């Protein structure tokens, strides 16, 4: 039985915090399936620069800035599915996540379009998870942003079992409980949020298996865009056009 690879992405600059625990709980739920293989990428401690609009990616077919983006790509590219997890910052994603998505999205387009190919149809199955210091501090906005980003990257976004009271488009957990609203394990006290994250993760695993089996069964009947792969090398140094 071919494994389904699920990548958990911890999009928090805070190491081993609530978002990391939320993503790990979600990944653990998928490990009950013998056909699932999990991996993890954490943004914490990584240097990820913002896009400066130099357009060198049009010339080189990839971003010329050698930083944590390439560590991310090493794990993202082979994954069949991804579970995005972020904390809510100012009713949105952390700036480092925005920087990652800006460059990754642009580079994906330029890598293929500048070589005369159509936009790739990766069809990665995606689930989105957020943790916030309050119940209603922008969780829905952040979930929507992540879900739309996945759609923009030709992903297949799934939700949990919303009829049971889970979040409609992902999972939102509360991590701001008193008396210590900044504790790194507060999210584990939110039983409903953890249950929602596990529900999303299970649906991601199931759908990823369906998509992978379907692509394998159809094989050459599908357009070439479904089987594109990156051919990337870490740039030696950045040469930017201001």
Task: Tell what function each PLM region has.
Residues 4, 60-169, 234-238:
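Helix-loop-strand module that forms the ligand-binding subsite of alpha/beta enzymes
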Residues 4-34:
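N-terminal beta1-alpha1 ligand-phosphate binding loop
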Residues 8, 38-40, 157:
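Conserved beta-strand scaffold positions in the cores of enzyme catalytic domains, especially
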Residues 13-14, 45, 133-134:
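Short, glycine/serine-rich, charged loops/turns that create anion-binding
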Residues 33, 156-242:
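Glycine-rich phosphate/pyrophosphate-binding loop and the adjoining helix
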Residues 40-63:
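N-terminal beta-loop-helix "entrance" segment that forms/cooperates
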């Amino acid at each position: 039985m071919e494994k389904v690879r699920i990548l958990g992405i911890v999009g928090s600059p805070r190491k081993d915090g609530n978002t990391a625990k939320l993503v790990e709980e979600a990944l653990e739920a998928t490990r009950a399936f013998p056909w699932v293989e999990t991996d993890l990428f954490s943004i914490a401690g990584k240097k990820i620069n913002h896009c400066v609009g130099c357009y060198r990616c049009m010339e080189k077919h990839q971003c010329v800035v050698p930083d944590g983006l390439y560590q991310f790509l090493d794990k993202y590219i082979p994954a069949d599915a991804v579970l995005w997890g972020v904390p809510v910052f100012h009713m949105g994603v952390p700036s480092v996540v925005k920087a990652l998505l800006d460059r990754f999205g642009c580079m994906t387009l330029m890598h293929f379009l500048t070589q005369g190919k159509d936009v790739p149809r990766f069809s990665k199955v995606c689930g989105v998870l957020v943790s916030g210091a309050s119940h209603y501090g922008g969780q829905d906005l952040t979930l929507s942003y992540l879900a739309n980003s996945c759609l923009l990257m030709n992903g297949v976004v799934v939700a949990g079992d919303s009829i049971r009271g889970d979040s409609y488009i992902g999972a939102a957990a509360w991590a701001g409980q008193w008396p210590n609203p900044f504790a790194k394990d507060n999210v584990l006290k939110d039983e409903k949020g953890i249950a929602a994250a596990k529900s999303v993760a299970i649906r991601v695993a199931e759908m990823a298996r369906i998509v992978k089996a379907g692509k394998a069964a159809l094989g050459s009947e599908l357009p070439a865009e479904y089987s594109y792969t990156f051919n990337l090398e870490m740039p030696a140094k950045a040469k930017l056009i201001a």
